[in-house]
Every structure is written in C-alpha cells, then in structure tokens.
C-alpha cells in the first residue's frame, strides 16, 4: 500500500512540475527584442482585413445609433489641462514635453471597452479606457493640431500581432481561440491571462485607475510606453450606488462637482537589453527593468459635464494614436493597424449617424 501511495505521490508531483514548466514556458517565452520595427510580408493584407471587420462590427452592433468599434460607452468627456513638469528629465524633452512648464488645454474621454452598447453596464467585468486629446500642439501626422494619448487599464494587450487580432475577431470571442490544436505549447495562455487581467471588476471611479498604452511609441530617439494614474493614492472614495448601470459616470459627476482632480502622465523607456519588445504587446515591460518616469501633470477641472449637448459632443469626437506629433509616432504592427482601424470606425459611424467630427475643440 505504501508503495502505491508513493507512486501516486511521485506521479502527482511530476504532473505538478510539468504543469509549472508548461505555464512558465507560455508566460516567460519571448521573441527577440529589437529597437526597430519589424514589418511582416503580409501585414498590409492583414490590416485591410482588420479594417473590414471593424466596419462589420460597427454595423452588426448598431442600435438606433452606430457606436465606436471599441470603447463604445463613454462615462464622460471632461475639460483638463496638461502641464509639463518643470523638472522633467532632459532626456525626455521631445514633442509636447520639449518645454518644461508647457501648458495645454485638453479633452479627456473615460470609457468602457465593450463594443456592444446594448449591454453597456458599468457593473460588468470589462476593460476601461482613458484618452486625452491635447489641443493646438502644431501639425500632427494626420494633418491635425492635436496630440492624443490613448490607454486602458491593463499594462499588456491580449493579442500579439495583427494576424492574431484577425483570428480573435473571426472567433467572435470564443475561448477556443486561445487553445487551438492538440499541441499545448502552441496555445496562447499568456494572451488569455492578459485578457482575463484586463476584464476586471469595475473600479470605484475612473479617476482612481491606472491606464497603460500597451503599444509602443517614439519619444524623440527613444521607444517608450506611457501610463496615466492619479497623483495620489485613493482616499475615502465613495462610489455611486453600484446597482446603477451608469455608476461610473455618476461617481465622476459627484467627484468633479466637488473638486478638481489630479493625474500624472509617466513614460517608460525601452531597454533593448531587456525583454521589452516593440512588436509583441502581450509581453509586459517590467518596471524593474525600466521604471516609469513622470513627465506631466493633468488637472481635470471642477465641472459639470453631463448636459445633453456635451454628451453629444463627446460622441462625435474621434480619437486616434496617429493624431500625434512626429516625435510621438506610434510604432509596431498593432499601432500601424490602429491607424486604419480607428479611421474606418470613425468614418463609418459618422456616416451612419449623419454626424461630423466637431470642428471647434477649444473651450
């Protein structure tokens, strides 16, 4: 009997060790890190597929109103200032951060990530987004005059390439996408983990969430990612009633009616000697390898933002990572796909809704 129990114990230990090795393989395996972008031979065709699928999703999910392909539900569009830190590291002084103390008007949009407005409940597990649009920065890559930083609440994304994104869209969110075939070493466990991490229970408030760029950008000669977070740790934050499907919006209404809010923008420089790839955005750039460095303060004004006119203005706004100065150019395959996907989503929904992007953004 003892021998049988011993053999069972050895088998269980072996299975456990194999399981640990298997998970470690998926979570720790990394591609070669480069400081340059890598463009695959079929990238243009893959991007064209993404664009068509974006339009298809907008069409299929439209109700009486065609919403965005992603981050369809806005909690608010609010007025804010961005001020470049006076003591910003000289190595980071490029683009809108070139001049210490530079001051910009901006709009910030807070959102849920779901594409489906028919089921847009703040209480549901979902990713959350923050996008800031700086005004009057000079001519950007899309011939506009804004600089936009778009982020969501998870530090890494759940697809590694444009091809993978197309496969995920084709699967319609079926979890079998992450475990295709009989070879477990070809499964996408790291990607599944990133998806589960992003789709978290709702925060108490959009103001007390960390928002990450996921994808990489230029900052002058550097490759960077960025993050936005509150200037201080949460203190006595009371959420609106969570039996309310719009409680995140209502929490913001209460907070910004009482006082202004402070957030900070930080950047993380790529170290090519570390596991910090540009192209595979499922891989976390570890802060132990390269810490986030503060570059600017964001002051969200005390305000009322829930008038029907401002909500419609918010719906008509369009954001894109490519509304950027050359010094902040988006890099990597997924960013290159986003250029066309965001444009397709905006053009398609504006055409269906018979609306236009607001021409005047100043306030």
PLM features per residue range, with description:
Residues 1-17:
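N-terminal Sec-pathway targeting helices
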Residues 22-363:
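Active-site-adjacent core segments of small-molecule enzymes
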């Amino acid at each position: 009997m003892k021998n049988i129990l011993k053999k069972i114990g050895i088998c269980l230990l072996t299975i456990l060790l194999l399981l640990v090795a298997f998970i470690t393989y998926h979570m720790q395996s990394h591609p070669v890190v480069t400081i340059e972008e890598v463009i695959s031979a079929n990238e243009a065709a893959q991007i064209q597929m993404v664009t068509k699928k974006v339009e298809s999703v907008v069409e299929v999910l439209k109700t009486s109103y065609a919403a965005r392909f992603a981050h369809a539900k806005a909690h608010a569009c609010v007025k804010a200032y961005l001020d470049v830190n006076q003591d910003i590291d000289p190595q980071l002084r490029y683009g809108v951060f070139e001049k210490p103390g530079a001051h910009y008007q901006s709009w910030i949009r807070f959102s849920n990530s779901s594409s489906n407005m028919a089921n847009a409940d703040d209480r549901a597990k979902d990713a959350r987004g923050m996008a800031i649009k700086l005004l009057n920065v000079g001519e950007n890559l899309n011939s506009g005059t804004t600089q936009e930083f778009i982020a969501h609440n998870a530090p890494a994304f759940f697809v590694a390439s444009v091809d993978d994104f197309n496969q995920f869209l084709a699967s319609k969110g079926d979890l079998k996408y992450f475990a295709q075939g009989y070879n477990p070493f070809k499964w996408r466990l790291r990607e599944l983990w990133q998806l589960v991490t992003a789709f978290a229970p709702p925060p108490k408030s959009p103001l007390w969430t960390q928002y990450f760029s996921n994808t990489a950008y230029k900052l002058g000669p550097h490759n960077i990612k960025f993050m936005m977070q509150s200037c201080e740790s949460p203190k006595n934050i009371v959420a609106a009633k969570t039996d309310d499907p719009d409680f995140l919006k209502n929490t913001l209404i209460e907070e910004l009616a009482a006082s202004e809010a402070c957030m900070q923008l930080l950047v993380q420089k790529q170290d090519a000697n570390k596991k910090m790839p540009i192209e595979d955005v499922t891989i976390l750039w570890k802060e132990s390898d390269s810490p986030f460095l503060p570059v600017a303060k964001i002051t969200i004004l005390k305000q009322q933002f829930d008038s029907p006119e401002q909500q419609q203005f918010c719906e008509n706004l369009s954001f894109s990572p490519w509304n950027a100065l050359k010094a902040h150019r988006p890099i990597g395959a997924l960013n290159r796909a986003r250029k066309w996907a965001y444009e397709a989503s905006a053009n398609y929904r504006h055409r269906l809704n018979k609306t236009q992007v607001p021409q005047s953004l100043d306030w």
